[in-house]
Amino acid sequence: MISANSLLISTLCAFAIATPLSKRDSCTLTGSSLSSLSTVKKCSSIVIKDLTVPAGQTLDLTGLSSGTTVTFEGTTTFQYKEWSGPLISISGSKISVVGASGHTIDGQGAKWWDGLGDSGKVKPKFVKLALTGTSKVTGLNIKNAPHQVFSINKCSDLTISDITIDIRDGDSAGGHNTDGFDVGSSSNVLIQGCTVYNQDDCIAVNSGSTIKFMNNYCYNGHGISVGSVGGRSDNTVNGFWAENNHVINSDNGLRIKTVEGATGTVTNVNFISNKISGIKSYGIVIEGDYLNSKTTGTATGGVPISNLVMKDITGSVNSTAKRVKILVKNATNWQWSGVSITGGSSYSGCSGIPSGSGASC
């Protein structure tokens, strides 16, 4: 005979088994295998703890349920393989990605570095983001990326804050093309309060709209860049703000580069209240002659730069550097004021500066 209590317990157990994971469920991924990842991804709170990702595999956190939180704890590492990556991929809406106190996401880049970047052995990109719906990525500690760090593509309404990217080891060990943030085909993205030590652009905005880069520190790389723009499927930058940033000991300070012979648009770009120091090549460089990672000396106007504001830019360049270089065509409606860069020398070959803009070399 089955008692009423037994029947109740059986019913509750069956309900628990049949009910999908609730918002309160937390799952932890640890160890050296991704075999349980498909199950972990169904949880609304995901902890990545002391994980070693197998060679040639992606920590695939794509397609997460809306509102999921991902927390990195301990040390995350990646076994070696020559491949394009990414090592981590995250997508979804209203996603929160956070770093716990004392954690590190270590790309162990020295295994791949050869001083050649894209021209050498195949190196994996580090973190690919496709996040929307007021998602947030905050407090991550990234160390020694093999290649580009954050690939921000097809994102919207995303805030990235308080990230530390430390690739200082690459300065002497062959790190190259270690961009901090690469932005493409994205809108309403805010990157703030981050610190980047690397060997390439601190940020490169290749396409997108309403991209804001504020209150960040950029060390040792190639500075803050719009572009290169041109030669891709999306060749429009409409709305970029770089405000209250510090660029230190970098090749360039502030840069816009468009591809020679290409078509596209760069408009509504604002560099405001940025400080530069220890710049090795150019304090400000705006060039329409970029091609195959070099400049040709001949600007073309297929990607015109319009509605450019350069305001309250201060600092210094090294003795062998140029303070400002401008080589463009078809540029319109520039407004420059409060640009005060000391050291170095002037660039004698500037051309294409819109009249009445206040810009000069």
Swiss-Prot record:
Family as reported in the entry's similarity comment: Belongs to the glycosyl hydrolase 28 family.
Keyword Signal: yes
Keyword terms, alphabetized: Cell wall biogenesis/degradation, Disulfide bond, Glycoprotein, Glycosidase, Hydrolase, Repeat, Signal
Record InterPro entries: Glyco_hydro_28, Glycosyl_hydrlase_28, PbH1, Pectin_lyas_fold, Pectin_lyase_fold/virulence
A biological process from GO: cell wall organization
Disulfide bonds: C27-C43, C202-C218, C350-C361
GO cellular component, one term: extracellular region
Repeat (PbH1) residue spans along the chain: 155-185, 186-207, 208-228, 237-258, 266-288
Positions of the catalytic residues: D200 (proton donor), H222
Glycosylation sites: N318, N330
UniProt protein name: Polygalacturonase
Catalytic activity field: (1,4-alpha-D-galacturonosyl)n+m + H2O = (1,4-alpha-D-galacturonosyl)n + (1,4-alpha-D-galacturonosyl)m
Known EC number: 3.2.1.15
Pfam families for this protein: Glyco_hydro_28
GO molecular function ontology, one term from the record: polygalacturonase activity
Originating gene: PGU1
Species this chain originates from: Saccharomyces cerevisiae (strain ATCC 204508 / S288c)
PROSITE patterns named among the record's database cross-references: POLYGALACTURONASE
Range of residues in the leader sequence: 1-18
